[in-house]
Amino acid sequence: EFPASQKSNDAGEVTSWFVSKWGPFLSNKMMRNILGQTKSGFNIREIMDNKKILLINLSKGKTGELNAKLLGMIFVMKFQAAAMSRADTAEDDRQDFCLFVDEFQNFSTESFESILSEARKYRLNLVLANQFMTQLTDKIREAILGNVGTIMSGRLGVTDAELMEKAFAPVFNAEDLHAMPNYSAIATVMMFDMPTSPFTMKLLPPMGESSNELMERMKVYASSKYGRPREDVEREIEARLADTSSKPAAPAMAT
């Protein structure tokens, strides 16, 4: 939204403000190709309803910190909107869908608060992972502890152990959380709409071996089914930009 303090009848000033905010994203070829397409190659609602798997790599090393944050926020809001659109489906017919968000503090917005408090009835389940509670704002932290049914914690640092102690008290204290051995955790889960007493659990160490060959084959298959040739995308975007730049500028509004 154009800031009230900068409102102007001059269309040129509005355009300049917009370009200054979006310029860093649109000047990045990868981001321009992602955001500049007129139609997405996949439908979030269809993915949720048909129990498909969508993997989104938002590595800062590949996309850049600012770009990763923007894309992460966009996807979170799209999943929220898709979940809310399930209002047109009978509650018993809604399929459970799990949204796993690693390092979610990078994408935490008010959408998370809304999802935590409202999206449960639309069968959107969140699995949120991060390293330190201090990475979260007080508002997000309170929303999590107040709405999440299952909380699982491995070994924590001193500060986080003190923050999380109340979730597992009086069975476990901060010292227990700080002294957890490897591949162990303390958890409390929701059963029959009631939280269980906190308990300890053993976690499985990494199992099996990854297959780079299989991974590459899956990437090729997914790209061929849902993607488009980069050259076609860039050609369409450049054509639209050229068409826009050739049009005369809108006259300034009279004051």
Q: Can you name each region flagged by the protein language model?
A:
Residues 43, 57-59, 132, 173, ...:
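Short, solvent-exposed coil/turn linker segments
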Residues 1-124, 140, 177-181, 187-195, ...:
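P-loop NTPase motor domains
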Residues 10-13, 17, 53, 70, ...:
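Conserved P-loop NTPase motor module
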Residues 58, 156, 203:
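Active-site donor-binding loop signature of nucleotide-sugar glycosyltransferases
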